[in-house]
Amino acid sequence: MRERQRGLDSNAAKIIRDRLRQHYHLQTDWSHLGFDRYREGIAVLSRYDFLMTDAGYVSSSQDVHSIDSRKVVMVQLHVPYMGAVNVFSAHLSWLSGGFFEQFDRLRAWANHKHGDHLAATFLCGDFNIKAGSEGYQAVVRSREYEDQYLAATSPSAFEKIFRQQSPNIDCHLAKDGRIDFIFMQKHSSLQAVAARELFTNGHYGRVSDHIGYCVEFEPNW
């Protein structure tokens, strides 16, 4: 999400929220300045009240003039018929910019917040790692967070990668160009039942150089 330095009125997430016909709650923060004028950050829009919010840097750099400075926002909310969930909205660096340390800090933070009182913990956003790449394989090796779009759209590949720990992850995902993901803590009590792409030429139209991903969940109690 971007906003000009003058403040929240120019924040892209707020502009989107203000145009929606229903009321949505917004949590947003920014990581660094892009092109020396835009506050580049992250956001969460929710139909449900926030029970808790937090934000913090997961990068070593906290210099607002450095593109390697990366902050994450976190919200906890109660979803009817499912329970409380934690959502972390992230935009991490490329491998060369510190992805590994940023992801390690993010998952440690998320794991610290996770507990039996939660139905799920989600790590969502632009991770700047291609599906099947070295960075993606690091997520798989953590054995903590799993790709929910893949679980819903390709159960066979999901099973081989996340359950059987296949050594050929890059082969299973050779045609998968995603760098944006919805990872769920594997001990969560929800399951992905459907998924689709958004913000394509056929679904709502393009809004950026990224595609959106929508995943539907049900309890698996």
Where are these regions (language model features)?
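Short beta-strand segments enriched in hydrophobic/aromatic residues
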Residues: V79, H91, F217-P219
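Active-site environment of divalent metal-dependent phosphoester hydrolases
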Residues: R2-Q5, G34-R37, L95-G98, N128-E134, ...
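Short aromatic-enriched loop/helix-cap "lid" or pocket-rim segments at secondary-structure transitions
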Residues: G7-L8, Y38-G41, F100-E101, E134-Q137, ...
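Metal-dependent phosphoester-hydrolase catalytic domains
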Residues: N111-F122, I129-W221
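Structured beta-strand-rich core segments of catalytic domains in phosphoester-bond hydrolases
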Residues: M1-N86, A194-E197
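Soluble or luminal CAZymes and related metallo-dependent hydrolases
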Residues: L8-A12, I67-R70, G98-R105, A131, ...
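Structural detector of well-ordered beta-strand residues that form the stable sheet scaffold
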Residues: H25-Q27, F88, F122, Y149
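His/acidic metal-ligating clusters that form di-metal
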Residues: K71-F88, G98-Q137
